[in-house]
Amino acid sequence: MGKHHQNLLNNLEELRKLAGLTQQDLSESAEVSRKSINAIENGIYVPSTVLALKIAKTLKCNVEDLFKLP
């Protein structure tokens, strides 16, 4: 599992790269800033449910593939 916040593990960076997307590409699709995507990838920020769903839709995966409880 990739980076983690104390309450959430995430695979966002790995799955984003597998999809061939940059942070900027993903941020535009999810309608957030590139800095927000970076903060999520580095475990600094936990996304809202809506944002997590937008990211999963863009990456064509389930939210559970992206984020897990420790």
Predicted regions and their residues:
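Short, charged recognition helix plus adjacent turn
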Residues: M1-G2, F67-P70
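A short, Lys/Arg-rich alpha-helix, primarily the initiator
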Residues: M1-L18
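Residue-level signal for the short linker/turn that defines the boundary of a DNA-recognition helix
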Residues: N10, L21, P47-V50
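Alpha-helical residues within the helix-turn-helix
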Residues: K17, E28, K57
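Short alpha-helical DNA-recognition segment
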Residues: L21-A39
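Short, conserved catalytic or interaction motifs in soluble domains
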Residues: N42
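DNA major-groove recognition helix of helix-turn-helix/homeodomain DNA-binding modules
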Residues: V50-D65
